[in-house]
From Swiss-Prot:
It comes from Bos taurus. Residues 259-297 are annotated as: 3 X approximate repeats. Disulfide bonds join C137-C163. It is found in: Endoplasmic reticulum lumen; Cytoplasm, Cytosol; Secreted, Extracellular space, Extracellular matrix; Cell surface. GO terms for molecular function: calcium ion binding; carbohydrate binding; unfolded protein binding. Calcium-binding chaperone that promotes folding, oligomeric assembly and quality control in the endoplasmic reticulum (ER) via the calreticulin/calnexin cycle. This lectin interacts transiently with almost all of the monoglucosylated glycoproteins that are synthesized in the ER. Interacts with the DNA-binding domain of NR3C1 and mediates its nuclear export. Involved in maternal gene expression regulation. May participate in oocyte maturation via the regulation of calcium homeostasis. The modification N6-(2-hydroxyisobutyryl)lysine is found at K64. This is Calreticulin. Can be divided into a N-terminal globular domain, a proline-rich P-domain forming an elongated arm-like structure and a C-terminal acidic domain. The P-domain binds one molecule of calcium with high affinity, whereas the acidic C-domain binds multiple calcium ions with low affinity. The interaction with glycans occurs through a binding site in the globular lectin domain. Sequence repeats lie at residues 191-202, 210-221, 227-238, 244-255, 259-269, 273-283, 287-297. The keyword Cytoplasm applies. Residues 18-197 are annotated as: N-domain. Belongs to the calreticulin family. GO terms for biological process: ERAD pathway; protein folding; protein stabilization. The gene is CALR.
Amino acid sequence: MLLPVPLLLGLLGLAAADPTVYFKEQFLDGDGWTERWIESKHKPDFGKFVLSSGKFYGDQEKDKGLQTSQDARFYALSARFEPFSNKGQTLVVQFTVKHEQNIDCGGGYVKLFPAGLDQTDMHGDSEYNIMFGPDICGPGTKKVHVIFNYKGKNVLINKDIRCKDDEFTHLYTLIVRPNNTYEVKIDNSQVESGSLEDDWDFLPPKKIKDPDAAKPEDWDDRAKIDDPTDSKPEDWDKPEHIPDPDAKKPEDWDEEMDGEWEPPVIQNPEYKGEWKPRQIDNPEYKGIWIHPEIDNPEYSPDSNIYAYENFAVLGLDLWQVKSGTIFDNFLITNDEAYAEEFGNETWGVTKAAEKQMKDKQDEEQRLHEEEEEKKGKEEEEADKDDDEDKDEDEEDEDEKEEEEEEDAAAGQAKDEL
């Protein structure tokens, strides 16, 4: 008798474990978030977050999130959860970001802090474990940060991961695995992956150049050399510019007044430029010398690069020039499949309706602008007609006054006679 696979795995104790959700925040309970999220008091002028679904959305309630509300401000807000270590298990960090303000410069990333963080004093120099998410500033910076704190030093990824820079909601996912590999996804599609050791400078290089090795003095690494049998032709050297043979001294040229006449110069058609001997293959060429490498005595492998003793706080510690960014659908779990499913059930469900609403607003705005432009032209034409009528009335009035003055003058002349 064949047993179903799930039942068989269960009997063998091999059934997949349920996902562990360490932190999840969707802001579905109105102002309840204010009890879970703590504002830092490190600076008195930190920007304020408000709960909003923005100017356009797929679902007004489901799409509500934390929105930055003040321009040119630093922001510092965090939420605490039960501490856990990712040692021996996968870590997945996921959230959505929406830059509906068409952001010009500002962060859209999160930071994961250890349990020792004082949330009321969180600031830009507070030590964190991981920083992940988009950062935009002008046309030159549109990247996804993936920064790990390793032995007290913040280490940046060696690759450039481009972030989304439009006005719609996007899903960002970071996966860190116990085999020291990682994956970055945007909108549930992989955009980067690889090895932690290869893509970050956590460790000294495995190999270094042998300090005792040097290129031999007789090593010839010239692939081409001058042909020793080649010589410059006798008629090669010609001046680059010559007097114009067709130029003539003007007839009215006065040498006492104008000085000695000199014809203008022109490009010499026989000028050949600098002579260089032709190149031939170097018979002594040995190739490019490669510096020999040796094992780096400073290198020591670390199988626990990925692991942290504890995570306990998720924070939004960032700067924005133009406010309006909305953060939502935060998730920290140990299950990649669950995170993907959660993303599809949140961002995935509302993204199409969000775009439809934005497209409708854009179309309405376009029609409104066209109508305003049309009204402006009509008013301009009406003003022009009014000015023309006014000018005609003034001309008629002037003609009438002139006629009256002429009649008065004629009457006065008649009386004098």
